[in-house]
């Protein structure tokens, strides 16, 4: 079995304001929490050339006032997602569907990278089960 591609390209990041509004408007989107990360996800029809999984990462200013800390946490979350996205992508690929996922940090404390990775992986597995 070939090893999964462990990259996070521009196409896999959510930039569309319409998609962001659809994610948070509650029209078919669902959420779950694995503290300190909350995941909001939306299953949709896949367009031609669209990646199976798209990501949005948010770390609120109320959690970390300094941008350096916010950026560090975002980097941890993106890295954990990049290494584990195949869990969700394999389930969606070939079904004509795609999933948009927003990962939101909820804690005012920093966490170790391996803990963040286990939480992200747990969320991706749980999202896969709910699809």
Regions found by a protein language model. Give the residues of each.
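Positively charged, solvent-exposed patches that mediate nucleic-acid binding
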Residues: 1-131
């Amino acid at each position: 079995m070939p090893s999964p591609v462990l990259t996070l390209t521009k196409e896999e990041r959510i930039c569309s304001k319409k998609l962001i509004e659809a994610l948070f408007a509650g029209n078919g989107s669902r959420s779950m929490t694995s503290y300190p990360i909350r995941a909001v996800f939306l299953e949709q029809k896949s367009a031609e050339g669209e990646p199976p999984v798209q990501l949005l990462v948010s770390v609120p200013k109320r959690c970390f006032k300094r941008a350096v800390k916010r950026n560090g946490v975002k980097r941890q979350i993106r890295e954990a997602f990049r290494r584990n996205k195949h869990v969700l992508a394999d389930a969606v690929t070939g079904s004509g569907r795609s999933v948009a996922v927003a990962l939101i940090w909820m804690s005012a404390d920093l966490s170790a990278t391996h803990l963040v990775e286990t939480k992200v992986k747990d969320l991706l597995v749980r999202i896969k089960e709910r699809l």
